[in-house]
Every structure is written in C-alpha cells, then in structure tokens.
C-alpha cells in the first residue's frame, strides 16, 4: 500500500547537491519509486557517473548537469533547458549547501 502511495512514475524531480551523501540517497529514492532524478552538482563527470549508475540499477532516464547554485544565470539557463527537454519539473529537492562556515573550517588546521 505504501509503495503505491509514494510512486513517482512519470515525475521529473530535480535534486541539487545530488552527489553528496544525502543527495545520493534522495536521488536513489526518486529512482526507486519510478521518478526521473535530474542531478545537479558542481562536477559534470561526477553527476554523469552517478546518473549512469542510477540508470543501470533502476532503469530510469536520469541525467546530470554541472551547476553552481550561487550562479543565478546558470540556474535560469538550466531550468529553461530542463523544461525544453522534459516539458516540466514536478519536484525539487534543495539539497545543495552554500555554507561559508564549512568552507572556513577547511582552512583551520
């Protein structure tokens, strides 16, 4: 019964920060329930590799895009491309983080 309730067949779900720890789990859950995870992160190679993994395991049509969530122009261009390619966006998982405290902590020895 729960499986039927949570099915995402035919749904296009965009996931920012898709190759991080939680992003990967979100993408796998979307794919597992029949949705199409659209993977956004900072490295094209990494999102492509992850999309290929999801496609092989779950038989979905996942794709990835290199996107910097702090770049508004990139985001607008990506949305236009996604609408052109898929005709819609059904959901968004805002998983990417832009936390200067995290960046600063990397500099501390």
Predicted feature descriptions by range:
Residues 3-38:
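Canonical Rossmann dinucleotide-binding motif of NAD(H)/NADP(H)-dependent dehydrogenases/reductases
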Residues 12, 36, 61-63, 88-90:
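Structural signature of beta-strand start/N-cap positions in the alpha/beta core
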Residues 16, 89-97:
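Rossmann-fold scaffold of SDR-type NAD(P)-dependent oxidoreductases
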Residues 33-50:
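Conserved glycine-rich Rossmann-like NAD(P)H-binding loop of the short-chain dehydrogenase/reductase
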Residues 44-45, 65-78:
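The beta1-alpha1 cofactor-binding region of Rossmann-like NAD(H)/NADP(H)-dependent oxidoreductases
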Residues 50-58:
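Short, conserved SAM-binding/catalytic segment
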Residues 76, 98-109:
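Conserved mid-core segment of classical short-chain dehydrogenase/reductases
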Residues 82-87:
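Glycine-rich phosphate-binding loop signature in dinucleotide/nucleotide-binding domains
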